[in-house]
Amino acid sequence: MAQADTAAVQQLLECDPVWAAYALADLQPAFAPVCAWTVGTDNVDRAVALVFTGLEMPTLFLSGPANAAADAVAQIPALPEQVYITVREEHVPVVDRHWDFSRDTRPMWRLALAADTALPHRETPGLMRLTAGDSDRLRALYRHGGPFTPDAFSPYQVDNGVFWGIADDDGALLAAGGTHIVNWELGVGAIGNMYTRPDSRGRGYAGVVLAAIVNTLRAGGVDNIVLNVDQRNEAARSIYEKDGFRIHCPYVEGIGVKRET
């Protein structure tokens, strides 16, 4: 789809801005080289497909009625051999026609924070705003691993977004989190990369970091704040709901391998 068509894409995405938050953020001109948009129709409704190639594996996002989404996928010039999906449950049959997801699918929740909600500031020793220069410290933190460890961190996310962390006396991060992507112009931000070191859990660090991220986004004019939670991660969901996030919809993430034709 030509760049001139992004205005039409934006109009369609804004029919459900919470679900489409990542895609709305991807409309920034800086991401144009790694975004391929198609619009499909079932002769009644329209849907959007986005193939994003800015990460190690291409990602596919769909928004709109399933039949129209199927038409949008059919218009993608070259389907990736491997793809990471972010799709609503009704879109799963659409993508399953083209890729095999038998090895990796994860049921997820999309949560959103009401536009008029801010979180109380929680001062904690070692709390600091992180910059791109802290990328190595973030990677070191995430290397502690375990279930639900962030697996899509990239330093560019720090450059464009908001990251906060809590460090010990030696400067090592005990907990951190930030944004996957922010579109300051459209007021959209997606929170992610949240992680607390296993030996530092149970101290409320996740809530402190979350509040710092949310309030920084709010100060920058971001009204549409979303985040994703694996449906198996009840502890994380509990933290987010305690701070006012509410479930918007279930959806599915997963890795698919292109089916042979």
Show the residue positions of the predicted features.
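Active-site rim helix/loop that mediates acceptor-substrate recognition in acyltransferases
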Residues: P17-A36, R143-D169
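Conserved acetyl-CoA-binding loop-helix of GNAT-fold acetyltransferases
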Residues: A66-P77, T196, G202-A219, N224, ...
